[in-house]
From Swiss-Prot:
This is ATP-dependent protease subunit HslV. It comes from Macrococcus caseolyticus (strain JCSC5402) (Macrococcoides caseolyticum). One of its GO terms (cellular component) is HslUV protease complex. Allosterically activated by HslU binding. It is found in: Cytoplasm. It catalyses: ATP-dependent cleavage of peptide bonds with broad specificity. The keyword Manganese does not apply. GO terms for biological process: proteolysis involved in protein catabolic process.
Length: 180
């Protein structure tokens, strides 16, 4: 049994001039035990101008969260520069390369994923999801953005995570949403 604590689904979208990120509250120990149902995996950073969410090993994610926030301050809130510098440090450090987590970061202008391999990815369609329910949330979000375009970014973020929670056993309905 894998005894690491894991946190799961995060979804983010930029749509109609707004951006929203949603995350569920479930933390799982291994494959069978829910340790916490109300974790807050989506947070505001840098004077509330940046929203970040994590999926993966909880301890690893908090380490990356703290490192990313330090990079944000070091580069005066420049989201892409902070993400790239974090990724460079992540790739270049033997200990950091062992971390099992991913981040989604966004501000009013950009949406990025910082992957577990130290890559920075900007989605083509301003929509992204990570974690065990990520593919379900991403599918729902893309369908809603395409076929229900009058919905707000917040509404799409909510519905996408609800869909993932209905399907993925590692995602629950305790959803936190942050909007910019």
């Amino acid at each position: 049994m894998n005894n690491q604590l894991h946190a799961t689904t995060i979804f983010a979208i930029r749509h109609n001039g707004r951006a929203a990120m949603s995350g569920d509250g479930q933390v799982t120990l291994g494959q069978q035990v829910i340790m916490k149902q109300t974790a807050r995996k989506v947070r505001r950073l840098f004077n509330d101008e940046v929203v970040a969410g994590f999926a993966g090993s909880v301890a690893d994610a908090f380490t990356l969260f703290e490192m990313f926030e330090a990079k944000l301050y070091e580069y005066n809130g420049n989201l892409s520069r902070a993400a790239v510098e974090l990724a460079k440090e992540w790739r270049g450090d033997k200990m950091l390369r062992q971390l099992e987590a991913m981040l989604i970061v966004m501000n009013k202008d950009e949406l990025l994923v910082v992957s577990g391999t130290g890559e920075v990815i900007q989605p083509d369609d301003d929509i992204i999801a990570i974690g065990s329910g990520g593919n379900y949330a991403l599918s729902a979000g893309r369908a809603l953005k395409r076929h229900a375009s009058t919905l707000s970014a917040r509404d799409i973020a909510q519905a996408s995570l609800e869909t993932a929670a209905d399907i993925c056993v590692f995602t629950n309905h305790n959803i936190i949403i942050e909007e910019i």
